[in-house]
């Protein structure tokens, strides 16, 4: 007696799940799943039936790209979403489900992104104002430490939310943070003395010294699940960090386009302007390719620094 024939639709769904599970990063898997479900909704397809993706053609992908652009999404975000879709279809090709990749750049062009990226950076003066904005109460002490870590390490917001108390340690003469980046890659980032001072003050205020596995930055007691010392024993969410940063930006009347990601751009730009080598910056930022690092560096006063002014004949 032979078993029942495999269900082709279930096999297709399993291929999609296998593609999604390739990334060791939970944040990446969540973002990829969101992008895929967004495309399925655009196509009028049920998220529980991704096997219907075999009907997708290049003109469908182009229409989705145009809809995203009309909705005001940035070119870099659209490119990222199209890259996700292209990756899925390429993976499905290896399973024999797709004849061609309908999201391939040979068929659908992604919008161009200027080399000087879209995220707004801060001047050193405005960054200083932001660092000094939080008050001196316990929540303000946390915010002062959090903003200092962002500004002095250039870490991503997702990396910040994964920091642990135990990952703040002494290595030789350096105070460092163990940062877990994309793909679960770990790197040690030295802390600037001002950031060390603020983190020390926060650890004492939150009574978390010695909690090796506990999250370094935590939501206040007013948030759901607050702990006995005024802060919950769980990490802050990415959105909470974003709201916190944007709140101080509004209070200071800074450029409304400044986001939490602006602190990463500011750190890399300022370090480059003050002589840091691009390879050192690449390691500092946790980038796999130095060309990615270059897209984070903003050109301040570009015209004044033009090579035209150093020419002599």
Give the location of each predicted region:
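Conserved catalytic core of the tyrosine transesterase superfamily
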Residues: 1-313
């Amino acid at each position: 007696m032979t078993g029942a024939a495999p269900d082709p639709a279930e096999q297709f769904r399993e291929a999609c799940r296998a593609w999604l599970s390739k990334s060791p990063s939970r944040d990446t898997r969540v973002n990829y799943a969101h992008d895929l479900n967004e495309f399925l909704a655009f196509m009028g397809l049920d998220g529980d039936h991704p096997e219907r993706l075999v009907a997708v053609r290049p003109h469908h992908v182009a229409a989705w790209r145009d809809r995203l652009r009309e909705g005001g999404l940035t070119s870099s975000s659209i490119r990222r979403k199209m890259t996700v879709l292209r990756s899925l279809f390429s993976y499905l090709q290896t399973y024999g489900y797709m004849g061609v990749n309908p999201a391939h750049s040979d068929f659908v062009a992604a919008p161009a992104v200027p080399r000087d990226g879209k995220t707004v950076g801060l001047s050193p003066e405005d960054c200083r104002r932001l660092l000094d904005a939080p008050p001196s109460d316990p929540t303000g002490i946390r915010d002062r430490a959090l903003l200092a870590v962002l500004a002095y390490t250039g870490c991503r917001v997702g990396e910040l939310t994964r920091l642990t108390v135990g990952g703040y340690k002494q290595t030789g003469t350096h105070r460092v943070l163990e940062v877990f980046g994309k793909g679960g890659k770990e790197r040690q980032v030295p802390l600037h003395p001002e950031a060390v001072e603020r983190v020390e003050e926060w650890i004492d205020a939150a009574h978390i010294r010695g909690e090796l596995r506990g999250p370094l930055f935590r939501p206040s007691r007013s948030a759901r699940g607050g702990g006995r010392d005024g802060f919950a024993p769980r990490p802050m969410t990415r959105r909470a960090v974003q709201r916190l940063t944007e709140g101080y930006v509004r209070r200071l009347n800074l450029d409304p386009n400044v986001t939490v990601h602006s602190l990463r751009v500011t750190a890399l730009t300022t370090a480059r302007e003050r002589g840091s080598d691009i390879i050192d910056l690449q390691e500092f930022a946790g980038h796999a390719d130095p060309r990615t690092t270059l897209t984070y560096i903003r050109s301040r006063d570009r015209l004044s620094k033009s090579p035209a002014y150093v020419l002599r004949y």
